């Protein structure tokens, strides 16, 4: 009887010792694997340069400021550049080979053939309906026109900032704007926007909610409308929904992979919506030339300096996606 008990105890102690040895062996093996893995990660991290999409650069820039005309020593081998220009530029140049010529000129500044895309738009109004900015860097050329100054300012505000937008059902709901960053953005072939502010009893202030003719008109037959109303007040809206889509949008911050180059005009357009803030010229630049070839030559000369005022992003702007960052 005692022999059986001693044997049981001996087996138990032996099992514990063996288990302890196995656990220590596994621990040493795991430590070896983990330390080796970390060593490999550290070595690779020093070799590989990863793209950081979260860098916020201090953005200033105006072609009114004197920049040194020089070529970057490091070519942008892994980036794409989109240059948007009005159709009047190609009409004036009237040369079927002009894009090839321009591509070769960009090559002298370090931009390989195939990395620069030249995209044409009809006019400011048409470009406002569905701006699509898909390249790593996007330069938009806008010819100054005193009759379209406000349209240019709205378009610049749209494409130079990131917006988070949601659809609005204006037939069922009232809407209010919560702060200065909250705007209603309407786009379409023809947008007429009317608003009626409401009091706490949901009665119209200076208007009848049942009669859109009494509403205040904030836009008439435009292609892009950024509507700003009194914050914290409910509004009944009337929009030409057959030809226009309105969205409730929140400005998230600057879209740093886009720059606007204004061609002509006495001063760079100010896109500041809030009158209490300092005027903004972030990534808004101006050059003055009568001929479009001179404009393109200047863009090529200064393209690398302009890119330095921007930040490469993986996001794109697409109106069909409610301008949301994708």
UniProtKB/Swiss-Prot annotation:
GO terms for molecular function: metal ion binding. Residues 1-50 form the signal peptide. Residues 253-255 are annotated as: GPR motif. It is found in: Virion; Host endoplasmic reticulum lumen. N-glycosylated. Glycans are attached at residues 238, 318. Ca(2+) 1 binds at residues 95, 206, 214, 216. It holds the Pfam family VP7. The keyword Coiled coil does not apply. One of its GO terms (cellular component) is host cell endoplasmic reticulum lumen. Residues 165-167 are annotated as: CNP motif. Keywords: Calcium, Capsid protein, Disulfide bond, Glycoprotein, Host endoplasmic reticulum, Host-virus interaction, Metal-binding, Outer capsid protein, Signal, T=13 icosahedral capsid protein, Virion. InterPro entries: VP7, VP7_1, VP7_2. Disulfide bonds join 82-135, 165-249, 191-244, 196-207. Ca(2+) 2 binds at residues 177, 228-229, 231, 301. Belongs to the rotavirus VP7 family. Some rotavirus strains are neuraminidase-sensitive and require sialic acid to attach to the cell surface. Some rotavirus strains are integrin-dependent. Some rotavirus strains depend on ganglioside for their entry into the host cell. Hsp70 also seems to be involved in the entry of some strains. In group A rotaviruses, VP7 defines the G serotype. Calcium-binding protein that interacts with rotavirus cell receptors once the initial attachment by VP4 has been achieved. Rotavirus attachment and entry into the host cell probably involves multiple sequential contacts between the outer capsid proteins VP4 and VP7, and the cell receptors. Following entry into the host cell, low intracellular or intravesicular Ca(2+) concentration probably causes the calcium-stabilized VP7 trimers to dissociate from the virion. This step is probably necessary for the membrane-disrupting entry step and the release of VP4, which is locked onto the virion by VP7. Homotrimer; disulfide-linked. 2 Ca(2+) ions bound at each subunit interface in the trimer hold the trimer together. Interacts with the intermediate capsid protein VP6. Interacts with the outer capsid protein VP5*. This is Outer capsid glycoprotein VP7. It comes from Rotavirus A (strain RVA/Cow/United States/NCDV-Lincoln/1969/G6P6[1]).
